[in-house]
Regions:
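Thr-Gly-centered strand-to-loop micro-motif
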Residues: 5-6, 30, 81-83
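Conserved AMP-binding/adenylation subdomain of ANL enzymes
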Residues: 1-2, 10-49, 64
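Glycine-rich, N-terminal phosphate-binding loop of Rossmann-like dinucleotide-binding domains
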Residues: 7, 13, 55
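Nucleotide donor/acceptor-binding cores
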Residues: 1, 7, 78
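Gly/Ser/Thr-rich phosphate-binding loop
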Residues: 23-24, 48-53, 62-107
Length: 107
């Protein structure tokens, strides 16, 4: 398991995911701040398998130019959890179209 945390660890959900990943012997990558391009780069660089986002992060990822969105290999991703706020249906549908059926709602 390779978990990418784009959210601050003073929130309980990312902190819990980081702790669980470490507990099972996985690798954790923690972003200092969320940057959509850097986020995609890190997924590819570290073959990230698990991540957790908020709907605003989805929106920022979807606003990237197509060339940036398709430049990175995201095939390692197995589970992407979104939480903390309701996700607009259109945003979630666009993310599923892009990443496939790996998006899980935790709200």
């Amino acid at each position: 398991m390779v978990y990418l945390s784009p959210a601050p660890l003073y929130h309980s959900a990312p902190q819990a995911a980081v702790n669980l990943t470490i507990r099972v012997g996985g690798t954790v990558i923690i972003m200092e701040r969320f940057d959509p391009s850097e986020y995609l780069r890190l997924i590819e660089q570290y073959s990230v398998t698990h991540t957790q986002l908020v709907p605003t992060m989805f929106s920022r990822l979807l606003k990237l130019p197509d060339a940036e969105r398709t430049r990175h290999d995201l095939s390692s991703l197995e589970i992407a959890v979104h939480a903390a706020a309701p996700c607009p249906v259109q945003v979630k549908e666009q993310m599923i179209d892009w990443w496939g059926p790996i998006i899980h709602e935790y709200y």
